[in-house]
From Swiss-Prot:
InterPro entries: PurM-like_C_dom, PurM-like_C_sf, PurM-like_N, PurM-like_N_sf, PurM_cligase
GO biological process annotation, one example: 'de novo' IMP biosynthetic process
Family to which the UniProt record says this protein belongs: Belongs to the AIR synthase family.
Cell location: Cytoplasm
Protein name listed in UniProt: Phosphoribosylformylglycinamidine cyclo-ligase
GO molecular function: ATP binding; phosphoribosylamine-glycine ligase activity; phosphoribosylformylglycinamidine cyclo-ligase activity
NCBIfam families (alphabetical): purM
E.C. numbers: 6.3.3.1
Gene designation per UniProt: purM
Keyword Cytoplasm: yes
């Protein structure tokens, strides 16, 4: 018995690496020292551009969205999701992404599927001047089923220490600016899949009412906010804190980016919750608290700023074709207005 008979095809793995080479190397910046194929990716840190450079790292996956995306052949899109989930996290510190690494594990290597995944990852990196420096594709028969794969991503960025954004400058009456999400993004899919399981005609119902393809809406790739944030920082707009709205929604993620004696006061009527969320809530009979604590509800990213920067930020977002708006302000925890902030969710 040989290795191939046991379920691991080394030759197919070599062919796969050869086929993804063009997509991967297309993301490489001048700081990449060597191409793919070595044991470790080599990257020249651009320290001359920084006084006290700090590396910022993040790792994440796409969660159970993968299960649904694979069944509907949305492989390119989940590659973008993978980059977005990692990159959106590290830019909250003010970091500029440098390079990305991916890990793909599968029961049996399907080159057509995984080539689309890597092209999606490459697209996400390339659009944000981030080098796809390397990765690992593991064929694991018996551990994963034949047609399934899992993804993990790792992103590293850089920022000057004196320009780190950590929320320490947040103060009372600062404004909160919301940046619109691209839909459900990559969180809440265990609940979504259960709703679909319990409503076997859900896609047809959605299309009949809204004249949109249900899975096209549901599986849109996560928005990457790096370019618009980078433009703001380049134009010397002071951002005091940033929050990537992921699992836990606004109630869990927004308070994380500020000192504990402050809390976000959010006007929940300042935006229209997208139809995909309302539809899921109805079909799943989701309680209000779970609704807010599971989904982003149309808000993918938040900024905390002084009011003087509101108009410049809204204009930059408009130039980048991202909807943005003032969603609330910062109040002290002992402020009497706190009872008005999502009381049914936070209490």
């Amino acid at each position: 018995m040989d290795y191939k008979t046991s379920g691991v095809d080394i030759e197919a793995g070599r062919e796969f690496v050869s086929e993804i080479k063009q997509a991967v190397e297309g993301t490489h910046t001048s700081n990449v020292i060597e191409g793919i194929g070595g044991f470790g990716g080599l990257f020249r840190i651009p320290i001359d551009s920084f006084k006290k450079p700090v590396l910022v790292s993040g790792t994440d996956g796409v969660g159970t969205k993968l299960e649904l995306a694979q069944s509907k052949n949305f492989h390119f899109e989940v590659g973008i999701d993978l980059v977005a989930m990692c990159m959106n996290d590290i830019i909250t510190s003010g970091a500029k992404p440098l390079f990305f690494l991916d890990y793909i594990a599968t029961g049996k290597l399907d080159k057509n599927q995984l080539l689309r995944v890597v092209k999606g990852i490459s697209h996400g990196c390339g659009e944000n001047n981030c080098s796809l420096l390397g990765g690992e594709t593991a064929e694991m028969p018996g551990f994963y089923s034949k047609n399934k794969y899992d993804l993990a991503g790792f992103c590293v960025g850089i920022v000057d220490e004196d320009k780190l954004i950590n929320g320490k400058k947040v103060s009372e009456n600062d404004l909160i600016i919301a940046l619109k999400s691209n839909g459900v993004h990559s969180n809440g899919f265990s609940l979504v899949r259960k709703i679909i399981q319990n409503n076997n005609q859900i896609d047809k119902e959605f299309e009949k009412v809204f004249h949109l393809n249900f899975y096209d809406e549901l599986l849109k790739p996560t928005k990457i906010y790096n370019n618009v944030i980078n433009q703001m920082l380049t134009e010397n707009i002071e951002i005091k804190a940033m929050s990537h709205i992921t699992g836990g929604g606004i109630p869990e993620n927004l308070p994380r980016c500020m000192p504990s004696d402050f809390i976000p006061y959010v006007d929940t009527g300042s935006w229209e919750i997208p139809i995909i969320f309302k539809f899921l809530k109805e079909k799943g009979s989701i309680p209000e608290k779970d609704f807010w604590n599971t989904f982003n509800l149309g808000v993918g990213f938040c900024l905390i700023i002084d009011k003087q920067f509101k108009d410049p930020i809204l204009n930059i977002c408009k130039d980048n074709e991202i909807d943005s708006w003032e969603i609330g302000k910062i109040v002290r925890k002992n402020d009497s207005t706190i009872s008005k902030f999502l009381p049914e969710i936070l209490t």
